[in-house]
Amino acid sequence: MTVNPMAPRILIMAGGTGGHVFPALAVAKNLAEKGWQVRWLGTADRMEARLVPQHGFDIDFIDIQGVRGNGLLRTLAAPFKIMRSIMQAREVIAEFKPQVILGMGGFASGPGGVAGRLAGIPLVLHEQNAIPGMTNKLLARIATKVLCAFPNTFALAGQSVQVVGNPVREELALLGSMKQQGQHDALKVLVVGGSLGAKVLNEVMPNVVAQLSRSLSITVWHQVGKNNLASTKACYQQMGQAVNVNVAEFIDDMEAAYRWADVVVCRSGALTVSELAAVGLPSILVPYPHAVDDHQTVNAAILVDAGAGFLLPQAILTSDNLAEKLSLFANNPEVLVQMGKQAREVAVLDATNKVAEICAELARKS
């Protein structure tokens, strides 16, 4: 592909989890379609190393790892590793010469953001979670523009923070306007525990299905995560119920999964919460209890407080109380419809365009 040397250039920093990478990819595609040169900064051992090239973008790697809670020796070595990674990022920036840098979380964002500001390049930060990560908390003090998905995420004296929502794929935003909910022959339950799955959901759901199938018609599509396929299938088979269950290690086509589902049982990562709002689906949210600063519980509150989801903390999750919640949906299809509408009410559907335009505006001024 021929590269226009006069095209505006952006360096995007996002990695580690899908909650960082997929929103950043949405912005990258938006800008690329407008003729921008997009380059990525990440780490070689995290998911961005695989996903970003698959979507057609060049990626550079720096050597950086998380330092929070990693022991005394790694903590003592951290300053030296951070300085080295900042120098590596400066080399990438000097070679690519971006007009603007977008940080959306992950290990590479810290060194890349510092290197960019040292080079005098505008830095845009986007925080996907309701509670900011440590890297974004620090970078927010030097960023040119701070964006967040949810209100009251940052408290920065003398600096404006703009709430723009979380970028989601265009096809998901469109799906929400077309999706119809109501009475079906069977309640369609989508179970998603993230790319690695959720052990507790893998263990509880087969028992839930066994309970519900005695009196209700239910069908399940269950993403169990890497290396959990055989064990979870065995759990369902041990229940001895003739239930329609599709068990998958990973669901590549989430649009199809959301289109199929009536209700979602899931963790409450920022991207998941934003996608549920965009597609207008009710949910039963089981926050990951070991997330930094318990940010998944705060994320979940966005939907729960809007009447779009139920919160079931992992500490009290049982097959009985999960089955009770799903029975409510199965026996009251009007609840599905109403909660789906409430989810759609909190959706921010133009977040991708907003983030892209803010980056473009700063690039024009630089």
From Swiss-Prot:
GO terms for cellular component: plasma membrane. SUPFAM superfamilies: UDP-Glycosyltransferase/glycogen phosphorylase. The keyword Nucleotide-binding does not apply. It catalyses: di-trans,octa-cis-undecaprenyl diphospho-N-acetyl-alpha-D-muramoyl-L-alanyl-D-glutamyl-meso-2,6-diaminopimeloyl-D-alanyl-D-alanine + UDP-N-acetyl-alpha-D-glucosamine = di-trans,octa-cis-undecaprenyl diphospho-[N-acetyl-alpha-D-glucosaminyl-(1->4)]-N-acetyl-alpha-D-muramoyl-L-alanyl-D-glutamyl-meso-2,6-diaminopimeloyl-D-alanyl-D-alanine + UDP + H(+). It is found in: Cell inner membrane. Its main location: membrane. Gene3D superfamilies: Glycogen Phosphorylase B (3.40.50.2000). CDD domains: GT28_MurG. Pathway: Cell wall biogenesis; peptidoglycan biosynthesis. Belongs to the glycosyltransferase 28 family. MurG subfamily. NCBIfam families: murG. This is UDP-N-acetylglucosamine--N-acetylmuramyl-(pentapeptide) pyrophosphoryl-undecaprenol N-acetylglucosamine transferase. It comes from Shewanella denitrificans (strain OS217 / ATCC BAA-1090 / DSM 15013).
